[in-house]
Swiss-Prot record:
Any GO MF annotation of the entry: cysteine-type endopeptidase activity
UniProt KW Heme keyword: no
Residue ranges of the motif Required for plasma membrane localization of USP12/WDR20: 1-4
Residues the entry annotates as binding Zn(2+): 186, 189, 233, 236
Domain USP: 39-369
Protein family according to the UniProt entry: Belongs to the peptidase C19 family. USP12/USP46 subfamily.
Biased composition (Polar residues): 157-168
Annotated protein name in UniProt: Ubiquitin carboxyl-terminal hydrolase 12
Active site: 48, 317
Phenotype upon changing residue 190 to K: Impaired binding to WDR48
UniProt xrefs under InterPro entries: Papain-like_cys_pep_sf, Peptidase_C19, Peptidase_C19_UCH, USP_CS, USP_dom
Length: 370
């Protein structure tokens, strides 16, 4: 058995090496970006949900730069962030241009910190992304809180802030956080009330044969509150019919869009996948911004896509496609391949049966040009 395992592992390593060599040749020495590395990640038992998100985040350049900068700071106690920083640093400082890295330390820490991921079952890539970003933000805020305990910041300046004040935004917020405004207009007195809500990613409903722009417009459709759902108007001091809609007040540097492809079917008593064809362009401008939006004309470029392959949330596979400089790459765990930009259309979804196996965009990462 041990001999068979060794032979199998050796064959796997040879295959990885061949793939890496082929990729390097395909890109060519003159076209290969300076100081860039393309490394696949070893799958430790259904960890493709994690690998695909990590690859997408690595090629969100502002995020990568902040994680690498964190690595250069004085050593902190081990956390999910230190493990992520070690992984990114390991990729960025490799002598080889292409290859494979085992993210074992990160996976071990992830399973230790959250029982949801402490198994060998397939997990949801969006849940992992959400958990990772919020955990990193919590770690950074806790570290800043510790630095403030003596009333001094790392640069030696005295901190006079109230300890009960809202935590300072972290670089996670600076990169991914946007703001929604929930507007409600009373149909009796026409008074408009609004409430702001921050987000790190937007989850949008999907429909057949549409585009991400259409999905975002649907996200901001006007909803009528009536019957038992009437709105309590402070001006009228009674429940009234009202119009409610959600608009984007502040657009983030990197816009992460989650396509809600998994829906619970009562007749099946389980979740199934909506493999609908949803076109996502290489360039994007949002039109559902509020009147007082701080940056309504922001243009975005697609930089990464986490793709779900399969027919349901608990089975299937995740891969990532990313833009690096002027070309696109596909990361499938330890395999890395160069693909044409036109090949992205293959990941829009299907025009036929919703329950069929499909390779369809699940999380889109758009980076602002400014």
């Amino acid at each position: 058995m041990e001999i068979l395992m060794t032979v199998s592992k050796f064959a796997s390593i040879c295959t990885m090496g061949a793939n890496a060599s082929a990729l390097e040749k395909e890109i060519g020495p003159e076209q290969f970006p300076v100081n860039e590395h393309y490394f696949g990640l070893v799958n430790f038992g259904n960890t493709c949900y994690c690998n695909s998100v990590l690859q997408a985040l690595y090629f969100c350049r502002p995020f990568r730069e902040k994680v690498l900068a964190y690595k250069s700071q004085p050593r902190k106690k081990e956390s999910l962030l230190t493990c992520l920083a070690d992984l990114f640093h390991s990729i960025a400082t490799q002598k080889k241009k292409v290859g494979v890295i085992p993210p074992k330390k990160f996976i071990t820490r992830l399973r230790k910190e959250n029982e949801l991921f402490d198994n060998y079952m397939q997990q949801d890539a969006h849940e992992f992304l959400n958990y990772l970003l919020n955990t990193i933000a919590d770690i950074l805020q806790e570290e800043r809180k510790q630095e403030k305990q003596n009333g001094r910041l790392p640069n030696g300046n005295i901190d006079n802030e109230n300890n009960n004040s809202t935590p300072d935004p972290t670089w996670v917020h600076e990169i991914f956080q946007g703001t929604l405004t929930n507007e409600t207009r009373c149909l009796t007195c026409e008074t408009i009330s609004s409430k702001d809500e921050d987000f790190l990613d937007l989850s949008v409903d999907v429909e057949q044969n549409t585009s991400i722009t259409h999905c975002l417009r649907g996200f901001s459709n006007t909803e009528t509150l009536c019957s038992e759902y009437k709105y309590y108007c402070e001006e009228c001091r009674s429940k009234q019919e009202a119009h409610k809609r959600m608009k984007v007040k502040k657009l983030p540097m990197i816009l992460a869009l989650h396509l809600k492809r998994f829906k619970y079917m009562d007749q099946l008593h389980r979740y199934t996948k909506l493999s609908y064809r949803v076109v996502f362009p290489l360039e994007l401008r949002l039109f559902n911004t509020s009147g007082d939006a701080t940056n309504p004309d922001r243009m975005y470029d697609l930089v990464a896509v986490v793709v779900h392959c399969g027919s349901g949330p608990n089975r299937g596979h995740y891969i990532a496609i990313v833009k690096s400089h002027d070309f696109w790459l596909l990361f499938d765990d330890d395999i890395v391949e160069k693909i044409d930009a036109q090949a992205i259309e293959e990941f829009y979804g299907l025009t036929s049966d919703i329950s069929k196996n499909s390779e369809s965009g699940y999380i889109l990462f758009y980076q602002s040009r400014d």
